[in-house]
Amino acid sequence: MSDYKDTLNLPKTSFSMKGNLANKEPMILNKWEKQGIYKKIREHFAGREKFILHDGPPYANGSIHVGHAVNKILKDIIIKSKTLSGYDAPFTPTWDCHGLPIELQVEKKHGKAGQSISEDDFRKECRKYAKKQVEIQKKDFKRLGVLGDWEQPYLTINFDYEANMIRTLAKIIENGHLSKGFKPVHWCTDCGSALAEAEVEYADKVSPAIDVKFKIKDKDKLAQAFGLDSLNHDAFAIIWTTTPWTLPANQAIAVNNQLNYSLIKIEDFYIILAENLVEQTLKRYAIENAQIIATTTGNKLTGIIAEHPFYSRHVPILHGDHVTDDSGTGLVHTAPTHGVDDFTLGKEHNLSMEIFVKGNGCYSENTKLFAGEFIFKANDRIIELLGEKKRLMNSDKIKHSYPHCWRHKTPLMFRATPQWFISMEKQGLRDKALQAIKETSWAPSWGQARIEGMVKDRPDWCISRQRTWGVPLSLFIHKETEELHPNTIEILYKVAEKIEKDGIEAWFNADDCEFITETAQYKSVKDTLDVWFDSGSSSMCILDLDKRLSYPADLYLEGSDQHRGWFQTSLLVAMSAKGSQPYKEVFTHGFVVDEHGRKMSKSLGNVTSPQDIYNTLGADILRLWTASTDYKSEMAVSDQILKRTADTYRRLRNTARFLLSNLDGFNPVTDIIEFDKLVKLDQWAIAKTKEFQDKIIEAYDKYQTHTVAQLIHHFCSIEMGSFYLDIIKDRQYTAKTDGHPRKSAQTAIYHIVHALVRWMAPILSFTADEIWDATLKTTDLPIQLCEWYTGLKSFDQDAELDLEYWAKIQEIRSEVNRVLEIKRNEDVIKASLEAEITIYADKYNYKLLEKLGNELRFLLISSKADLKVIEESTSSSIAANIPGLLIEITKIEEPKCERCWHRSSTVGDNPQYKDICSRCVENITTEAGESREFA
């Protein structure tokens, strides 16, 4: 037996089978750094049409989690796909660097500002801490393969950014949107500060639910309201509340003029309830012998005076539009300093706005009975006191959704304080913002309705904070009237100039006289700006000012929580400062959860960290998982899910390796064969690749990364792995090295590789770089500077063997493979090359298959394939799952060729080569080798 190994075209490539990504990726990153790859991209695409994806700043505190990784990877994929489409698509990373979380970290080490450490030194430590956190996160983002201007990121602590925030505020004031107000705002006792809507999250809380009796002072007036002559017992207005701690601040009871109210006798007293709530309320009280005495409307009750349940204070009954008879009692306890509706009613009727609760959540010294107590702890004492005073009608517990601080996870209170607001109504900001939302493209589409609802119902934006680490509000107000200084705009621009030079410290360390001359009449405001104003100003501070970028951004892409956060604050800042929306399109992705749909939590032990993933599996696995997951909803990740992703990656890598290894000896300059002269199957491969490329580019353009990932996987596994590459192995390995059949396949492979590596590049950035290095090419450009491959061709419209034809051939081949598997399981054959395949076809299928002539066997990977009319079928033939087709498999008895392993009667025909077939002899001995037309 001769050794024919040297006569075969065995595959050869430098591209390894094993990814070994965790070790290789840092080396590739190092190469990119040395090449200055991001700078080269910017230079290469300078002057092209721009595409701007504006980065929403992550908070500079702690290592990145998998949600951060998903967000940056998705952005990177989109940027890279836009670059492939020929856009100048810069990516400038940003970071949010002011605010309470950083203050808290610095406090742990240095103590509170103004106590253990000076405020100036405290700010320096905050700045130092933020910069350190940025470097930690930056290293992780770069390790993920995210390309961007990492050397010049935008930090909200950059002096120019801080200054431009002040200039943005000046524009907002100039446009008439700023207002000062004494209003109830969400207040965190742990933060010691007001919170913006975006900083409030809702969680279940168990609260006391009590019904309180307010004794009616003038029974005769009440009797008259119900059309009665008199009342012979005391009467009580009943309110229901889940915040007993607000009762010291009660100033009124609200009813609705349009609702009906009932007077009910219970033993020796009367109570007032909304008519529609009588039955369920009495049931809640477990009272069965009550008697409804009379009914009246709410407008008859207004003006009647009640008595506070434990203070010597008169409480009027007033009309309130917010009062309903859906729940409670239909009479609403009103504490103007602790609720928005309460405050509105209080302003309307000039009720007392006395402050009973301090910023730390304790009652002030002027709060009788409870001075100094923490409000939530005082609930039990208040309930006890109501019982002693015989003013407690009912006491229960309720589990309900309650506002909590997003940082401390502790319950919030509504507290009226003097604050600065961006008014939603003053200059029609709400209506303008709602119109801008309509003019923006939202994906998923429900995002539009979500943000519309939020903007429609949101209160004025409280932008002032009582914190140390933040951009100063930089305002001066009159010491008596508290009106803004008449030269506020000029002063703000002056402040901005100083901050641009020395940072926010230039304000905090300056005397008022450095900015104004009228220090006897005016004083500076010590508040800082809401940290959401920092990030919300990014479109004004970055897009509108950086000539490398453009306003508005083409795309904002963040998590779905940003409808109430950055999407909304960006919109409000831009609309109030510039009068136009900051974005053309807004995309949201879901949160990352575990495989059971649970939120990531250390206590559950289900946290998947990006660092663990890239240090074990590699960043490309994390990138592939991110791209493969439909990010419009929750994104599930776990070790098992990542293992499946790694399996998918191996299939893609093996496909690339097979393609590359079969280009050995191919010269793309001299060996390329024109499309019309290729073997028909190779024409199909190129046309099919073109079809997939069109779909992939369309999916990238729609930011449908999961569709891209599915298409690439299907292309590699089905179109290539299960069909094309499986068929051409014989031709690649056994045909004459420089013969037409092999060069034809290599031409197709060359085109496929150049298309495939570009499809992969946005997602599998490290692997694509590795493939590119191993690819034959006629350019010195790195893959990051390439555009979509243009060397593919489609079939002409009149092509006989077009994509539709080959799709039918694939169906038939799948059926043949199914029957081959049956015969393998029956031990009739061990491999398909041992099979003699006979296909019995009706007229339609016969016509399809006969076009392939004697090359049908190569498509079926068998040694012999016969085509016969269906009428000749035998009892041993098996019906295909295609109408008009029967398949018969028998074991071929002819000898095996030791070179190509086909069974052939021609083995031994040539006395010089006794153990190989005539086809192999032809490939070894003749100048041209065998010829192929179809497969």
UniProtKB/Swiss-Prot annotation:
GO terms for biological process: isoleucyl-tRNA aminoacylation. A motif ('KMSKS' region) lies at residues 599-603. L-isoleucyl-5'-AMP binds at E558. Belongs to the class-I aminoacyl-tRNA synthetase family. IleS type 1 subfamily. CDD domains: Anticodon_Ia_Ile_BEm (cd07960), IleRS_core (cd00818). PROSITE patterns: AA_TRNA_LIGASE_I. Its EC number is 6.1.1.5. PANTHER family: ISOLEUCINE--TRNA LIGASE, MITOCHONDRIAL, SOLEUCYL-TRNA SYNTHETASE. Its main location: cytoplasm. Keywords: Aminoacyl-tRNA synthetase, ATP-binding, Cytoplasm, Ligase, Metal-binding, Nucleotide-binding, Protein biosynthesis, Zinc. Monomer. The gene is ileS. A motif ('HIGH' region) lies at residues 58-68. This is Isoleucine--tRNA ligase. ATP binds at K602.
